[in-house]
């Protein structure tokens, strides 16, 4: 999110984007992937940090988000429920407030859609649904 911007847009389920927005994203992804294949340096995410929160373990989700951030110049903070107080000793709302002050975007892979939505409601940065029992 740009400094001074007040618009926070989350991606919590498929209906959060319109068809033309998906078309734009897929076209941008195609262009970026082609640049990568051509060894063109393209790092628009320099000095940006993604927090990945995993309540549900994953290989492909973690690798795809992490590799994408690094390839585009960003960095990643990987959090698991086993290695943090997320959802246990610390309410999800407090975690959202604190974590979102330190990163530029958050991806969450969790069991409950309501937990994802609660985090997003208290986040200062965009939140992406990495998977819930309801949406993927």
Q: Model features per residue range: what roles?
A:
Residues 1-63, 67:
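Positively charged, low-complexity intrinsically disordered leader regions
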Residues 44-136:
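Phosphate/diphosphate ligand-binding glycine-rich loop within oxidoreductases
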């Amino acid at each position: 999110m740009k400094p001074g911007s007040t618009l926070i847009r989350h991606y919590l389920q498929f209906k959060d984007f319109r068809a033309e927005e998906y078309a734009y994203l897929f076209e941008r992804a195609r262009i970026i992937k082609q640049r990568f294949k051509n060894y063109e340096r393209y790092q628009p995410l320099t000095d940006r940090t993604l927090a990945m929160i995993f309540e549900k373990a994953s290989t492909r989700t973690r690798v795809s988000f992490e590799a994408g951030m690094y390839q585009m110049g960003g960095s990643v903070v990987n959090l698991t429920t086993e290695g943090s107080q997320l959802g246990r000793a610390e309410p999800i709302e407090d975690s959202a407030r604190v974590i979102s002050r330190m990163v530029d975007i958050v991806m969450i892979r969790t069991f409950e859609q309501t937990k994802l939505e609660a985090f997003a409601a208290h986040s200062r940065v965009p939140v992406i649904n990495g998977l819930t029992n309801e949406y993927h």
